């Protein structure tokens, strides 16, 4: 089980990303538009740098919904390998069978 503070920190980052998504997208569009003047693009980069670091989507860590584990995360299911194994052994995931040969 992950520390509650780590999970909460990640949830806070998700909230910040949602809150600043439109502003960040607009500033990036201005900064990357080569048809605009260099000063305008530079000002957009400065405003982008003033945004909180945690408002960038790359700072979000995928975590298991059940345990909060940050590694061995299956994107399709939203859980870690440990949780997947537990649920699979209980027969709670349809179509998942233990392989044997």
Curated annotation (Swiss-Prot):
GO biological process, one term: translation
Signal peptide per UniProt: none
Pfam families reported for this sequence: Ribosomal_S14
InterPro entries: Ribosomal_uS14, Ribosomal_uS14_bac/plastid, Ribosomal_uS14_CS
Gene Ontology annotations for the cellular component aspect, listed alphabetically: cytoplasm; small ribosomal subunit
Gene3D superfamilies: 1.10.287.1480
UniProt KW Cell membrane keyword: no
Keyword annotations of the record: Ribonucleoprotein, Ribosomal protein, RNA-binding, rRNA-binding
A GO term for molecular function: structural constituent of ribosome
Superkingdom in the source lineage: Bacteria
Family per similarity comment: Belongs to the universal ribosomal protein uS14 family.
Function comment: Binds 16S rRNA, required for the assembly of 30S particles and may also be responsible for determining the conformation of the 16S rRNA at the A site.
Quaternary context: Part of the 30S ribosomal subunit. Contacts proteins S3 and S10.
HAMAP family in the record: Ribosomal_uS14_1
Protein name: Small ribosomal subunit protein uS14
Protein species of origin: Methylorubrum extorquens (strain PA1)
């Amino acid at each position: 089980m992950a520390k509650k503070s780590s999970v909460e920190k990640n949830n806070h980052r998700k909230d910040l990303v949602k809150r600043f998504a439109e502003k960040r997208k607009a500033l990036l569009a201005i900064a990357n538009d080569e048809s605009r003047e260099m000063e305008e693009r530079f000002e957009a980069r400065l405003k982008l740098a003033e945004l909180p670091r945690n408002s960038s989507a790359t700072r979000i860590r995928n975590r298991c919904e059940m345990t909060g584990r940050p590694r061995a995360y299956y994107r399709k299911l939203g859980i870690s390998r440990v949780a997947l194994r537990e649920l699979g052994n209980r027969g709670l995931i349809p179509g998942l069978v233990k392989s044997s040969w």
